From Swiss-Prot:
One of its GO terms (cellular component) is mitochondrion. This is DNA-directed RNA polymerase subunit beta''. Its EC number is 2.7.7.6. Its cofactor is Zn(2+). The lineage of its organism: Eukaryota, Viridiplantae, Streptophyta, Embryophyta, Tracheophyta.
C-alpha cells in the first residue's frame, strides 16, 4: 500500500482484506477528498498492483480443488428422517398438503443453509489456499451460492411458475446429479434461456415507454420558487437508517432546520453525508426536502428541486436531460437482471424463525389463561401468546425466568418436564423484509373415487346458496369414502345378510311433505286392527324416521327432480313434483293359486311412509301389470284426441332447466300412446359407422359390435361425454308448404285422417306420430312414426286381492284401485338393455270415511306386525286409525327418533305386547337390521330398483351369549332410549317402533368369510348403497341423483373375539371414522382408515376411506355426500408465501404499477382511492377549494405510494435506484387532471386531460372554478397525452394522432427532445440549451412578494400550510414503506 501516496511518513497502514464493497467505499471517499483526476491516478496504481500479484500467484482451478463438506452425509440423512415423519403425519391426516409443503421446504432449506455456513470454515481449516475458496470468497469471481452448488448441495429449485419443487437436489455438481435431479435442475437453465429471449424485449419496451413519458424533462431553471416540501421523519424502528440516508443525500432542503433556537441548516442548502449524520445524531423534527414532485415548472424541472447530480455530486447543471436519465435508470436493471435467474431457495415466509431454548432441565410453568391453542404454520399444535408471557423453569436448585415476546408460539405444555436446550417457544420473525408476499392457491385433488364427507358444519359462499363452494369455519377432516359409480349392471357381492331391512328410493311416485314427528303406536281398542294378510315372507317393517333433514345441504325449494305422475282419479290431473324421499317396498310372494292365475309374474309392492304415517289418499301398495311392459325405449304421449289438442291443452313450462308439460285442463286419460324408438348410448371414443340423418335398414352395423334392431332414420347427439344414437322407424314425407311443418311437428294423427300438406295423400290405418326433421344441408322433411296404443283398463276388483274377512269389518276404511302413468307426456324413456320399462302402474289408494267423528283423523299409522306360529314367521300390515296417545317430536341432536320402552305400561297400551310377552321381547335380540336403497345415475335417465328379499323361512332362536344379553338388559333399564350407535346392524338402520330385539337364524346364511359369494337373488342388483352417518351421529340421506358401487376389496372385515362383546359398544360405534393404525381390537392396530358401516355380533365391516385435513378458510368443493371421481378438486387452500428471488417476476409488477393496471383481486386499487379522495375533499371544502385541494392531496398521496411500490420491487432484488428517478416518472403520470363538468365550456371540453398547474392558472385567470378531478394515467397513456403531437405520433398510433392533431389544428412548440430529433433541429439540452436561455433575466429579479400578490395564491398557500401536518404524517410514514397500514386496500400483492 506504500506505493499509493508520496508522503509515506504520516500514512496509516491498514492490514485488511478488501472486497468489492470496500473498494466502492474507498473510491467514493477518494473522490470526495481528491477529486476525479487524482482518484483515477490512484486507482490505476491499485489495478497494476492487483494484476502483478495475481500473475505471481498463478492460480489454476482443477476438479480436485472442489472439496465436498464431510458433515453433509448425516445432515441429509437427518433431513430425510424428518421428511419421513412428516409424510406419516400427512398420511394419517394430521397435517394438510400446504403445511407439509411448507415444512418440507423449510427442512431442506435449513439443511442447505447449514451446509453453506459449514463451507467457509471447512475450507479455512482444511485448505486455506484452495483456489475455489480464494476466488469466490475474495469476490473476484463466483459467489457463495455458486460454490455451495459445486461443493455443498444444489438444494431447492423452483419450477417455471416460480413455485418451489419440494424435491430437493441433494447432490452437488462435484458428486454428479441423478436423472431426476438433473431434470429438475434444468428448469433453471431453461428458464434462463427463455427469459433471455422474452424478458429482455419486455425490459427494452418498458425502457422505451419510460423514456417516451419523460423525454422532454430538462433542467431549465435554477429555482422555481416553490415553498412546498415533502417531510421525512428521522429514522425510528420502522425505517432503516440506510434508507433514511439514501433518501436525504443529494437533496435540497425546503425549509430551515432548527435545534432549539439554533439553525443548523438553511433553506435551499443541499444535503451531504455530514449534514445527514448531524440529523441522525440530533434526532431532529421531520426534515422538509424538495423533490421533483414539489417543482412548480410545468414541463421541465429546476436545479434545486432535482438536487445533486448522481455523477459528480454537485448540483445538477442547467440543460441536463434528467428525464431520459430517469427513464433509463429504471429500465436498465430490468435488461441487466433478466439474465440473472439463479434460484437459491428461501421461498417460504419470513425465513426460519428464532427459537427460545430451555436454559436447564426442569418443569416449565406459565399462566394458561394468557395463551390460547393454535396450529403453527407446519400444523403442529402450539399455544399462541398475545402479550409478554413469563415462563418459569424450575430445576432442582435454581429457578429460571424466561420472557417470551407477544405473537410467539409456545411449543410445550404447562407443567411439562423439559430438557436443557429443548426448544420451548418460537418467536415469529418481526423484522420487516422487502419480500413480495403473494397469496397462492393450492388445490388438493382426491386420490381415489368415492363419496365425500366432512366432519364439521360448513359455510356456504354467501352469493350462491346452492353452489358447491363451502368455506370451512374450523379445522376438520374431509373423508373420501371408497366406492364409485357403477360400471356394470351387477354388483359382485352383497354384504347384507338375509332378512336385512331394505330401503328403496322410488322416484316416480308422489309423496307429501317430510314429516318430523315420530310416533309410537298406542291403541286403546284392540278390535279395530286391520290385519292385511297375504303370504308375506318378506320384511319386518316399522316406523322409520325420515332423515332427510340431516342432509345438511338439502335444498328443499330447489328440487331439480321432477317426475310428473298422472293419477287417474275422479277425472283430476295432478302434476306431482317428486321430493327426495325414501320408501319401503315389500314384494309379495303370492301363495294362493287364484292370484297366480291373475298375475302370473308380477309382484305387488307395499310401501309404508318413512315415519309410519299415512295421509288420506296415499298409495298403500302397487303392482306392475305385464301388459304395460315394454322392452325398448320410446316416448309416451297422451291427451284428448284431436289434431292440435296436445299443443293446446298443455303449456310448456321450464322448471329447473327441465322441460315439463303442465296440464291446464282436467282431462280423463283413458288411453295413451307409446312411440317406440331404438336408443344406443355409446362412449365418446366409439367410432360410429352411420351418419346423422341417414336412413338405415334393419340389422345394419352401427358400431363394431352392435347392430340395429329396427330400420329407420338415424339421429346422433352428443351429450355430456356420451354419444346418444337414436333410430326412429317410420316413413319419410316431403311437405308441400314449408311453414306448416312446424305447426305439425310432434303431433298425433288418428287413423283415417287425410293430410293435404304432404305430396302424396294417403290414409293411415293406425295412429301415427308426425315429427319434422331439419337436416343440416338438405331440405326439410317430415317423419311419420308408428304408434302403439295402450288402453288403461278399469281397476281390478278388490275381492281378488284380499281374503274376504278383513274387509267385511266395517271400519270406514276404503281401498281403491287407481292406474297411473309413470312417465310424463312427451318424456323420452330410456330402456337399459335387458330390462323392461313399466309404463302404467296400478296402485291401491288408502282412504277412510270422515263420517265417524271418533276416528276422523287426517292421518293413520301403519306398522308391520310379525306373528310366529310353530317357528314360522308371518307378517301383517296393521293400519291403525286411532290417533296415538304419545308422539315424540325429534330433536336435531337425537336423529334416531325417540323410542319408547316402558315397564309400567299395561299390555293393552302397546299392541305388540299382545303378540309377544314382555319377557320374550327382552330376551330376543335382533342380529341384523339393514337398509339398501337404489339411486339413479347422474344423467337421471335410467332407473334401478333393488328389493332384497328371500323366500326362505326362518326359525327364531334364543340368544346364547349371556354376557351380551346382560349388557342389553342393563342398558334398557338404565336408559329407555337406546341410541343407534351401540346397537348392532349396518350403519343407518333405524330402530324398531317398540324396540324389541330378536335373533334370526336363517337356513342358508351368507358366510362372512366368503365375502364374494352372493345368494341367488331373483333380481339383478344394480346399485348398492347405505345410509351414511357422520362423526356427530347425524344420519344423512344421500342424494338420489348419484350412485355408488362398493368394491368388495374396499371393505375390510374385522372379526371380534367372543369374549370381546361386553366392551364392544364402547369402542366401536356405528358410523365412526378410524384413522390408520388405530387400535380397534386386541389383535393390534387397524391398518387402513375407514368408516364402520356394519357392526355384527362377531365382526365389524369397515368401508375404507381416505382422510384429508383442511384448515379454516379453506374452500371445499362439492357437496356433502357427492361422489367424486379420481382427480377431482377437493379443497383449495389459500396461503401466503414470499416470491422467489429474481427480477423477472418483479418486472411485470413494476410495469403494472407504472401502467396503473389493477394487479389482481388483491391489487392496490389506486384509482379507486383517487376517486374516493376526490369525492370526500369536495364534500368537506365545497366547490372551488375542493377541486383544487382535492386534486392536490390526491396527487400527493398517490405519488408517494407509487414511488414506494416501485422501490419495493427493486429493493427486493437488491437493486439501488435513487428515488428521484422514480419521482420524475411518477410526476408525469400523475400530473394530469380530468375536466369533469362543462362549466367552463369556452376553455376546456369535459373529459379533456390537462395539467394540474394549467388548470389552476386558468382558474385564477378567469376567476371562476373549473371542475376537475385527479386521474392516474399509465405510462403508455401519458406518452399519448403530451403537449407535442410529433412526439406522440412517433411513439404509437401514428395515423390517428396526426389526423386528430390536424383536425384540432394543434401547434407543436418543439420543446422536447424527440420532436427536434424527428425534425432534425437542435436538441434543447446540454450545449444546445444555451441558445434557449432568453427571457429569464429580468424575470428572476422581480422579488417573490410582488409575484405572489394575487389573493388566490396567498389563500391557497395558507391552506396548503394548514394541511401540511396531514401531508407530513402521511408522507413521512409512507416513505417508511408502511403504505399498507395507512391506506386500506393497498395489500402488497
Amino acid at each position: 500500500m506504500e506505493v499509493l501516496m508520496a508522503e509515506r511518513a504520516d500514512l496509516v497502514f491498514r492490514n485488511k482484506v478488501i472486497d468489492g464493497t470496500a473498494i466502492k467505499r474507498l473510491i467514493s471517499r477518494l473522490i470526495d477528498h481528491f477529486g476525479m483526476a487524482y482518484t483515477s491516478h490512484i486507482l490505476d496504481q491499485v489495478k497494476t498492483l492487483g494484476f502483478r500479484q495475481a500473475t505471481a500467484t498463478s492460480i489454476s482451478l482443477g476438479i480436485d480443488d472442489l472439496l465436498t463438506i464431510p458433515s453433509k452425509g448425516w445432515l441429509v440423512q437427518d433431513a430425510e428422517q424428518q421428511r419421513l415423519i412428516l409424510e406419516k403425519h400427512h398420511h394419517y391426516g394430521n397435517v394438510h398438503a400446504v403445511e407439509k409443503l411448507r415444512q418440507s421446504i423449510e427442512i431442506w432449506y435449513a439443511t442447505s443453509e447449514y451446509l453453506r455456513q459449514e463451507m467457509n470454515p471447512n475450507f479455512r481449516m482444511t485448505d486455506p489456499f484452495n483456489p475455489v475458496h480464494m476466488m469466490s470468497f475474495s469476490g473476484a469471481r463466483g459467489n457463495a451460492s455458486q460454490v455451495h452448488q459445486l461443493v455443498g448441495m444444489r438444494g431447492l429449485m423452483s419450477d417455471p411458475q416460480g413455485q418451489m419443487i419440494d424435491l430437493p437436489i441433494q447432490s452437488n455438481l462435484r458428486e454428479g446429479l441423478s436423472l431426476t435431479e438433473y431434470i429438475i435442475s434444468c428448469y433453471g437453465a431453461r428458464k434462463g434461456v427463455v427469459d433471455t429471449a422474452v424478458r429482455t424485449s419486455d425490459a427494452g419496451y418498458l425502457t422505451r415507454r419510460l423514456v417516451e413519458v419523460v423525454q422532454h424533462i430538462v433542467v431549465r431553471r435554477t429555482d422555481c420558487g416553490t415553498i412546498q416540501g415533502i417531510s421525512v421523519s428521522p429514522p425510528n424502528g420502522m425505517m432503516p437508517e440506510r434508507i433514511f440516508i439514501q433518501t436525504l443525500i443529494g437533496r435540497v432542503l425546503a425549509d430551515y432546520i432548527y435545534i432549539g433556537s439554533r439553525c443548523i441548516a438553511v433553506r435551499n442548502q443541499d444535503i451531504g453525508i455530514g449534514l445527514v449524520n448531524r440529523f441522525i445524531t440530533f434526532q431532529t423534527q421531520p426534515i422538509s426536502i424538495r423533490t421533483p414532485f414539489t417543482c412548480k415548472s410545468t414541463s421541465w424541472i429546476c436545479r434545486l428541486c432535482y438536487g445533486r447530480s448522481p455523477t459528480h455530486g454537485d448540483l445538477v447543471e442547467l440543460g441536463e436531460a434528467v428525464g431520459i436519465i430517469a427513464g433509463q435508470s429504471i429500465g436498465e436493471p430490468g435488461t441487466q437482471l433478466t439474465l440473472r435467474t439463479f434460484h437459491t431457495g428461501g421461498v417460504f415466509t419470513g425465513g426460519t424463525a428464532e427459537h427460545v431454548r430451555a436454559p436447564s432441565n426442569g418443569k416449565i410453568k406459565f399462566n394458561e389463561d394468557l395463551v390460547h391453542p393454535t396450529r403453527t404454520r407446519h400444523g403442529h399444535p402450539a399455544f399462541l401468546c398475545s402479550i409478554d408471557l413469563y415462563v418459569t423453569i424450575e430445576s432442582e436448585d435454581i429457578i429460571h425466568n424466561v420472557t417470551i415476546p407477544p405473537k410467539s408460539f409456545i411449543l410445550v405444555q404447562n407443567d411439562q418436564y423439559v430438557e436443557s436446550e429443548q426448544v420451548i417457544a418460537e418467536i415469529r420473525a418481526g423484522t420487516y423484509t422487502f419480500h413480495f408476499k403473494e397469496r397462492v392457491r393450492k388445490h388438493i385433488y382426491s386420490d381415489s373415487e368415492g363419496e365425500m364427507h366432512w366432519s364439521t358444519d360448513v359455510y356456504h359462499a354467501p352469493d350462491f346458496t346452492y353452489s358447491n363452494v363451502h368455506l370451512l369455519p374450523k379445522t376438520s377432516h374431509l373423508w373420501i369414502l371408497s366406492g364409485g359409480s357403477y360400471k356394470s349392471s351387477v354388483v359382485p357381492f352383497s354384504i347384507h345378510k338375509d332378512q336385512d331391512q331394505t330401503n328403496v328410493y322410488f322416484l316416480s311416485a308422489a309423496k307429501g311433505k317430510a314429516r318430523n314427528s315420530f310416533s309410537v303406536n298406542n291403541d286403546q281398542d284392540q278390535g279395530k286392527h286391520k290385519f292385511f294378510t297375504s303370504g308375506l315372507s318378506g320384511k319386518k317393517e316399522s316406523g322409520i324416521p325420515d332423515y332427510s333433514e340431516f342432509n345438511r345441504i338439502l335444498d328443499t325449494d330447489h328440487s331439480n327432480l321432477i317426475f310428473p305422475s298422472i293419477l287417474h282419479k275422479d277425472s283430476d290431473l295432478f302434476l306431482l313434483a317428486k321430493r327426495r324421499r325414501n320408501r319401503f317396498i315389500i314384494p309379495f310372494q303370492w301363495i294362493q293359486e287364484r292370484e297366480k292365475e291373475l298375475w302370473p309374474r308380477s309382484s305387488i309392492s307395499i310401501e309404508i311412509p318413512i315415519n309410519g304415517i299415512f295421509r288420506k289418499n296415499s298409495i298403500l301398495a302397487y303392482f306392475d301389470d305385464l301388459q304395460y311392459r315394454r322392452k325398448g325405449s320410446g316416448i309416451t304421449k297422451y291427451g284428448a284426441i284431436g289434431l292440435h289438442s296436445i299443443l293446446k291443452k298443455e303449456d310448456l313450462i321450464e322448471y329447473g332447466g327441465v322441460k315439463e308439460f303442465k296440464p291446464k285442463y282436467q282431462t280423463k286419460v283413458d288411453q295413451f300412446f307409446f312411440i317406440p324408438e331404438e336408443v344406443h348410448i355409446l362412449p365418446e371414443s366409439f367410432s360410429i359407422m352411420v351418419r346423422n340423418n341417414s336412413i338405415i335398414g334393419v340389422d345394419t352395423r352401427i358400431t363394431l359390435n352392435t347392430r340395429s334392431r329396427v330400420g329407420g332414420l338415424v339421429r346422433v347427439e352428443k351429450k355430456n361425454k356420451r354419444i346418444e344414437l337414436k333410430i326412429f322407424s317410420g316413413d319419410i314425407h316431403f311437405p308441400v308448404e314449408m311453414d306448416k311443418i312446424f305447426r305439425h311437428s310432434g303431433i298425433l294423427i288418428p287413423p283415417g285422417r287425410v293430410k293435404k300438406e304432404f305430396k302424396e295423400s294417403k290414409k293411415w290405418k293406425n295412429w301415427i306420430y308426425v315429427q319434422s326433421i331439419t337436416p343440416t344441408k338438405k331440405k326439410y322433411f317430415v317423419l311419420v312414426r308408428p304408434v302403439i296404443i295402450y288402453e288403461i283398463a278399469d281397476g281390478i276388483n278388490l275381492e281378488t286381492l284380499f281374503p274376504q274377512d278383513p274387509l267385511q269389518e266395517k271400519d270406514n276404511l276404503e281401498l281403491r284401485v287407481v292406474n297411473y302413468i309413470l312417465y310424463g307426456n312427451g318424456k323420452p324413456i330410456l330402456g337399459i338393455s335387458g330390462t323392461c320399462i313399466q309404463l302404467v302402474r296400478t296402485c291401491l289408494v288408502l282412504n277412510w270415511d270422515q263420517g265417524n267423528k271418533s276416528s276422523s283423523s287426517e292421518e293413520t299409522h301403519a306398522s308391520f306386525v310379525e306373528v310366529s306360529t310353530r317357528d314360522l314367521i308371518r307378517d301383517f300390515l296393521r293400519i291403525n286409525l286411532v290417533k296415538s296417545h304419545i308422539s315424540y317430536i325429534r330433536k336435531r341432536n337425537d336423529p334416531l327418533g325417540s323410542v319408547l320402552i316402558s315397564d309400567n305400561r299395561s299390555d293393552r297400551t302397546n299392541p305388540f305386547y299382545s303378540i309377544y310377552s314382555k319377557e320374550k321381547i327382552r330376551q330376543l335380540l335382533k342380529e341384523n337390521q339393514g337398509t339398501i336403497h337404489t339411486l339413479l345415475n347422474r344423467s337421471k335417465e335410467s332407473q334401478s330398483l333393488i328389493i332384497l328379499s328371500s323366500s326362505n323361512c326362518f326359525e327364531m332362536g334364543p340368544f346364547n351369549d349371556v354376557k351380551h344379553y346382560n349388557v342389553i338388559k342393563e342398558s334398557i333399564k338404565r336408559d329407555p332410549l337406546i341410541p343407534i350407535r351401540n346397537s348392532l346392524g349396518p350403519l343407518g338402520t333405524a330402530c324398531q317402533v317398540a324396540n324389541f330385539y330378536y335373533i334370526l337364524k336363517t337356513h342358508n346364511q351368507i358366510s362372512v368369510t366368503k365375502n364374494l359369494q352372493l345368494e341367488n337373488l331373483k333380481q339383478t342388483f344394480q346399485v348398492l348403497k347405505y345410509y351414511l352417518m357422520d362423526e356427530n351421529g347425524r344420519i344423512y340421506n344421500s342424494d338420489p341423483c348419484s350412485n355408488i358401487l362398493f368394491n368388495p376389496f374396499n371393505l375390510n372385515w374385522h372379526f371380534l373375539h367372543h369374549n370381546y362383546c361386553e366392551k364392544k359398544s364402547t369402542i366401536i360405534s356405528l358410523g365412526q371414522f378410524f384413522f390408520e393404525n388405530v387400535c380397534i381390537t386386541k389383535h393390534g392396530p387397524h391398518l387402513k382408515s375407514g368408516q364402520v358401516i356394519i357392526v355384527q355380533i362377531d365382526s365389524v365391516v369397515i368401508r375404507s376411506a381416505k382422510s384429508y385435513l383442511a384448515t379454516p378458510g379453506a374452500t371445499v368443493h362439492g357437496h356433502y355426500g357427492e361422489i367424486l371421481s379420481e382427480g377431482d378438486t377437493l379443497v383449495t387452500f389459500i396461503y401466503e408465501k414470499s416470491r422467489s428471488g429474481d427480477i423477472t417476476q418483479g418486472l411485470p409488477k413494476v410495469e403494472q404499477v407504472l401502467e396503473v393496471r389493477s394487479i389482481d383481486s388483491i391489487s392496490m386499487n389506486l384509482e379507486k382511492r383517487v376517486e374516493g379522495w376526490n369525492e370526500r375533499i369536495t364534500r368537506i371544502l365545497g366547490i372551488p377549494w375542493g377541486f383544487l385541494i382535492g386534486a392536490e392531496l390526491t396527487i400527493v398521496q398517490s405519488r408517494i405510494s407509487l414511488v414506494n411500490k416501485i422501490q419495493k420491487v427493486y429493493r427486493s432484488q437488491g437493486v439501488q435506484i435513487h428515488n428521484r428517478h422514480i419521482e420524475i416518472i411518477v410526476r408525469q403520470i400523475t400530473s394530469k387532471v380530468l375536466v369533469s363538468e362543462d362549466g367552463m365550456s369556452n376553455v376546456f371540453l369535459p373529459g379533456e386531460l390537462i395539467g394540474l398547474f394549467r388548470a389552476e392558472r386558468t382558474g385564477r385567470a378567469l376567476k371562476e372554478a373549473i371542475c376537475y378531478q385527479a386521474i392516474l394515467l399509465g405510462i403508455t397513456k401519458a406518452s399519448l397525452n403530451t403537449q407535442s403531437f410529433i412526439s406522440e405520433a412517433s411513439f404509437q398510433e401514428t395515423a390517428r394522432v396526426l389526423a386528430k392533431a390536424a383536425l384540432r389544428g394543434r401547434i407543436d412548440w418543439l420543446k422536447g427532445l424527440k420532436e427536434n430529433v424527428v425534425l432534425g433541429g437542435m436538441i434543447p439540452v446540454g450545449t444546445g440549451f444555451k441558445g434557449l436561455v432568453h427571457r429569464s433575466k429580468q424575470h428572476n429579479n422581480i422579488p417573490l412578494e410582488t409575484k405572489k400578490k394575487n389573493l388566490f395564491e396567498c389563500e391557497m398557500r395558507d391552506i396548503l400550510f394548514h394541511h401540511k401536518e396531514l401531508f407530513d404524517f402521511c408522507i413521512s410514514t409512507n416513505i417508511h414503506d408502511t403504505s399498507e397500514h395507512l391506506f386500506l386496500g393497498f395489500n402488497d400483492s
